[in-house]
């Protein structure tokens, strides 16, 4: 359990929807969207690395128990929430997810408070696709997708409507923004077909990186190398996952106009 006591806990409301947000650091903002089952200690660890790089880390509490260790039971409980199911179903149909609307509002709040040219965002696992959906917003200058895992029943699916992908591509071209994406080669939740589909839709604006499975540390209850910057990251010099972590944080820093540490 991580008490998260080095973060400032706030509440943010938009369209009658209120979520807690944990904020740490100074400098331009980076939204760290948690993976299932929520803000785990490893998600918080990544946010602290963002903070220590001279950026402001903002973690919205979208589901689960804040600070709790991950487990299959907690993930099933989070996925089974009616509110969470409605969010993902709306996103999948292209009808426009209230969650994306709220996250775009949060991006505006964070940008107004922290300044800089814009914000960064990283989505992980179930929230990986949300980072791409947010890239329609000109505030988002550094979008990162880490093992985007939806839809689970279609390895080539992007979980974003075709018209929305066209609009996102146009915005990326207009503002010269690229999308970084990461997965492990043998990840059964985020397979090669999804990255192929995203490459087809986004062209050279999509910058994928595929890590070999033997670069992963722990795999956790999922049973395969999966969580690139959290559970499976090995925080040691010379480790590929640590290098990827550094690459992502440098991408945030340079895109948001601060010197990379």
Which residues are covered by each model-predicted region?
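N-terminal cap/leader regions of alpha/beta-hydrolase-fold enzymes
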Residues: 1-261
């Amino acid at each position: 359990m991580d008490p998260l006591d080095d973060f400032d806990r706030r509440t943010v409301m938009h369209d009658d929807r209120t979520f807690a947000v944990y904020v740490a650091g100074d400098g331009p903002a980076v939204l760290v969207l948690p993976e299932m089952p929520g803000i785990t200690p490893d998600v918080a660890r990544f946010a602290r690395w963002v903070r220590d790089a001279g950026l402001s880390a903002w973690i919205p509490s979208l589901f689960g128990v804040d600070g709790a260790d991950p487990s299959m039971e907690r993930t099933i409980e989070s996925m089974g929430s009616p509110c969470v199911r409605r969010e993902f179903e709306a996103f999948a149909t292209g009808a426009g997810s209230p969650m994306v609307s709220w996250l775009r509002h949060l991006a505006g709040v964070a940008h107004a408070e922290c300044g800089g040219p814009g914000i960064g965002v990283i989505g992980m696992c179930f929230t990986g696709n949300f980072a791409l959906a947010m890239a329609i917003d000109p505030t988002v200058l550094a979008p990162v997708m880490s093992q985007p895992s939806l839809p689970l029943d279609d390895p080539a699916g992007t979980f974003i409507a075709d018209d929305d992908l066209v609009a996102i591509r146009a915005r990326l071209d207009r503002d010269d923004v690229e999308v970084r994406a990461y997965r492990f080669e043998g990840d059964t939740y985020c397979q090669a077909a999804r990255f192929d589909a995203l490459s087809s839709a986004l062209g050279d604006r999509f910058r994928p990186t595929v890590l070999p499975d033997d670069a992963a540390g722990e795999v956790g209850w999922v049973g395969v190398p999966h969580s690139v910057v959290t559970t499976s990251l090995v925080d040691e010099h010379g480790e590929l996952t640590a290098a990827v972590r550094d690459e992502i944080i440098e991408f945030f820093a340079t895109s948001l106009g601060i010197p990379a540490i």
